[in-house]
C-alpha cells in the first residue's frame, strides 16, 4: 500500500551556484558518501531528499543527513534512513521505498514513493 509520494525538481545551475557561494552548504546537505558527486547527479540527490521529505509529509526536525541516497549494484537509486526520518517512516509503517532520479537540460528531478 502506498503511504506517500513526493516529487521535486531542481535547477542544476542555481543549485551549483548556491554550493559555490557557500562551501559549507555541501557538508550540511549531504552525507560523506554523497559529497563526491558533481553536477546534475548531486542536484538529483538533493531533489531525492526533498521528495522523500514530501512523501513523509515534511516532518519537523528532519535533518538533511537523515537520508542518504546512493546507487545499488546495477545503478538503481536507494535510500538509507536514520534519525527523525527513520522514526517517522517507522511510525507510518513504511517498509520500502521506490526512487527515480533524472537530470537533463539543466533540470534535476526525483520522485519518491513510500510503501508499507
Curated annotation (Swiss-Prot):
Gene3D superfamilies from the UniProt entry: 4'-phosphopantetheinyl transferase domain (3.90.470.20)
Class of the enzyme per the UniProt entry, highest EC level: transferase
Cofactor or coenzyme needed: Mg(2+)
Cellular component GO terms, alphabetical: cytoplasm
GO biological process, one term: fatty acid biosynthetic process
Catalytically driven reaction(s): apo-[ACP] + CoA = holo-[ACP] + adenosine 3',5'-bisphosphate + H(+)
EC number: 2.7.8.7
GO function terms (MF aspect): holo-[acyl-carrier-protein] synthase activity; magnesium ion binding
Compartment(s): Cytoplasm
Main location: cytoplasm
Keywords assigned by UniProt, alphabetized: Cytoplasm, Fatty acid biosynthesis, Fatty acid metabolism, Lipid biosynthesis, Lipid metabolism, Magnesium, Metal-binding, Transferase
A Pfam cross-reference name: ACPS
Residue numbers binding Mg(2+): 8, 50
Entries under HAMAP family matching the protein: AcpS (MF_00101)
Family: Belongs to the P-Pant transferase superfamily. AcpS family.
Function: Transfers the 4'-phosphopantetheine moiety from coenzyme A to a Ser of acyl-carrier-protein.
Protein name: Holo-[acyl-carrier-protein] synthase
Source organism of the structure: Beutenbergia cavernae (strain ATCC BAA-8 / DSM 12333 / CCUG 43141 / JCM 11478 / NBRC 16432 / NCIMB 13614 / HKI 0122)
Amino acid at each position: 500500500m502506498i503511504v506517500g509520494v513526493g516529487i521535486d525538481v531542481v535547477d542544476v545551475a542555481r543549485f551549483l551556484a548556491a554550493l559555490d557561494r557557500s562551501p559549507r552548504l555541501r557538508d550540511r546537505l549531504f552525507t560523506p558518501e554523497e559529497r563526491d558527486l558533481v553536477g546534475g547527479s548531486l542536484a538529483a540527490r538533493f531533489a531525492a531528499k526533498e521528495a522523500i521529505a514530501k512523501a513523509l509529509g515534511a516532518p519537523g526536525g528532519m535533518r538533511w543527513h537523515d537520508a542518504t541516497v546512493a546507487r545499488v549494484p546495477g545503478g538503481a537509486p536507494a535510500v538509507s534512513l536514520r534519525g527523525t526520518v527513520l522514526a517517522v517512516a517507522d511510525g507510518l509503517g513504511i517498509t520500502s521505498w521506490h526512487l527515480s532520479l533524472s537530470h537533463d537540460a539543466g533540470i534535476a528531478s526525483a520522485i519518491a514513493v513510500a510503501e508499507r
